[in-house]
């Protein structure tokens, strides 16, 4: 049997780049909660003892940016300098301006346009992907790496492993076989976890706890065997972490946010962007389209691309490829997709309820992936029925 290895990585919510994503989306949530028409393009950067939020926001909402920054850092666990950042004592810098009037008139005509006439906020192309190898219709490598990261945070916060600190990274290599274009996972080849820890714990204790409390509950036993390789804190020491260890920036974990290297990526990040930014809304709707194709049994694996021009409502192109796994021709699947999904930005915002913020709606997406999540707020994960014409 001919097989191959494929690897996906993840980082958990205390990684400095992910901290920035969560702050940007927490600000988006706060704006949309008060003013669903908010136009938000919010970036965050962080380094030792400093968080800065900057960008363009036009909103009627009254938002305390500094309060949101500090509370988000605190929720993640950055409560003292020795864990990487002190939420209450760090410097918070804010440089927020209004959206460019040139962009505003071209995209939404200063709010005079009907939803179906709202133009894309920028040019770009986005990809959605789905595969039948997991119940989530997501790649197994990505699912396992992401769930390991989430479990790391869970056992830190519930004090199962009190030596854990917020920063951490995971990576999973899976051995696959290609079944006529569909991906069949055979076994987990390698598991890598690098997690921040306190001064008191030994490397042996770290390895034992990670195997027992993180790996065992997450990776199904059928994928592990005597030959599975474990690299558990292979650098030997990871006490300094968070923004103290590395600078962080919004939008630097776009593969972790999506499909772990499977499918394709148009390059646009998600966090801190309202739904007129097709980097986000376009990527969400093509995930829904690809997932609907696989869920309907029309293909075992599917990728969908959409592209836009700034100020133009209709997409420039829609593309589908089922990797030769389709039960009907790809051109017929494309017809079904175009009939079932409205790719105009104003309509995507309505149909996926993307103007609704608050209650951590978008902040939740900013750690542990935007896709494959079982959560009613992830409206783009709800499949649409697709039936070929008789």
Curated annotation (Swiss-Prot):
Reaction(s) catalysed (UniProt annotation): L-methionine + ATP + H2O = S-adenosyl-L-methionine + phosphate + diphosphate
Enzyme Commission number: 2.5.1.6
Main location: cytoplasm
Cofactor: binding comment: Binds 2 divalent ions per subunit. The metal ions interact primarily with the substrate. Can utilize magnesium, manganese or cobalt (in vitro). Binds 1 potassium ion per subunit. The potassium ion interacts primarily with the substrate.
Sequence positions that bind Mg(2+): 9
Keywords for this protein: ATP-binding, Cobalt, Cytoplasm, Lignin biosynthesis, Magnesium, Metal-binding, Nucleotide-binding, One-carbon metabolism, Potassium, Transferase
Listed cofactors: Mn(2+); Mg(2+); Co(2+); K(+)
Binding site for K(+): 43
Residues that, per the record, bind ATP: 15, 167-169, 235-238, 246, 252-253, 269, 273, 277
Outcome recorded upon mutating residue 167 to N: In mto3-2; accumulation of free Met and increased resistance to Ethionine
Description of activity control: Inhibited by 5,5'-dithiobis-2-nitrobenzoic acid (DTNB) and N-ethylmaleimide (NEM) (in vitro).
PROSITE patterns attached to this UniProt entry: ADOMET_SYNTHASE_1 (PS00376), ADOMET_SYNTHASE_2 (PS00377)
Compartment(s): Cytoplasm
Molecular-function annotations in GO: ATP binding; copper ion binding; methionine adenosyltransferase activity
Gene3D superfamilies: 3.30.300.10
Pfam families (UniProt xref): S-AdoMet_synt_C, S-AdoMet_synt_M, S-AdoMet_synt_N
Subunit comment: Homotetramer. Interacts with GRF3.
Family, as annotated: Belongs to the AdoMet synthase family.
Function: Catalyzes the formation of S-adenosylmethionine from methionine and ATP. The reaction comprises two steps that are both catalyzed by the same enzyme: formation of S-adenosylmethionine (AdoMet) and triphosphate, and subsequent hydrolysis of the triphosphate. Involved in the biosynthesis of lignin.
Protein name according to UniProt: S-adenosylmethionine synthase 3
Gene field: METK3
């Amino acid at each position: 049997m001919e097989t191959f290895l494929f690897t996906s990585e993840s980082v958990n919510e205390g990684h400095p780049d992910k901290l920035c994503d969560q702050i940007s989306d927490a600000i988006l949530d706060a704006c949309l909660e008060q003013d669903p028409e908010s136009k938000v393009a919010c970036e965050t950067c962080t380094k030792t003892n400093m968080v800065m939020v900057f960008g363009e926001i036009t909103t009627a909402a009254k938002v305390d940016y500094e309060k949101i920054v500090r509370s988000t850092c605190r929720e993640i666990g950055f409560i003292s300098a020795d864990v990487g950042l002190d939420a209450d004592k760090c410097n918070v810098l804010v440089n927020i301006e209004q959206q460019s009037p040139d962009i505003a008139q071209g995209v939404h005509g200063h709010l005079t346009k009907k939803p179906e006439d709202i133009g894309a906020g920028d040019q770009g192309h986005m990809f959605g992907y789905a595969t039948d190898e997991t119940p989530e219709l997501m790649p197994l490598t990505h699912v396992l790496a992401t769930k390991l990261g989430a479990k790391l945070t869970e056992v830190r916060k519930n004090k199962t492993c009190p030596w854990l600190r917020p920063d951490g990274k995971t990576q999973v290599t899976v051995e696959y076989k290609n079944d006529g274009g569909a991906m069949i996972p055979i076994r987990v080849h390698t598991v890598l976890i690098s997690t921040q820890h306190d001064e008191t714990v030994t490397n042996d204790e770290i390895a034992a706890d990670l195997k027992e409390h993180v790996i065992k509950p997450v990776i199904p036993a059928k994928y592990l065997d005597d030959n599975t390789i474990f690299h558990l804190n292979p650098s030997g020491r990871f006490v300094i972490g968070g923004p103290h260890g590395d600078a962080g920036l919004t939008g630097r974990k776009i593969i972790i946010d999506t499909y772990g290297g499977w499918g394709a990526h148009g390059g646009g990040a998600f966090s801190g962007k309202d739904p007129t930014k097709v980097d986000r809304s376009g990527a969400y709707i093509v995930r829904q389209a690809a997932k609907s194709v696989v869920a309907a049994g029309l293909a075992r694996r599917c990728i969908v691309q959409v592209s836009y021009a700034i100020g133009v409502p209709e997409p420039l192109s829609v593309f589908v490829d089922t990797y030769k796994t389709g039960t009907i021709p790809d051109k017929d699947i494309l017809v079904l997709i175009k009939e079932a999904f409205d790719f105009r930005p104003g309509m995507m915002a309505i149909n996926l309820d993307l103007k609704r913020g608050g209650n951590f709606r978008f902040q939740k997406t900013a750690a542990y992936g935007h896709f494959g999540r079982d959560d009613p707020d992830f409206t783009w994960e709800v499949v649409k029925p697709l039936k070929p014409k008789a």
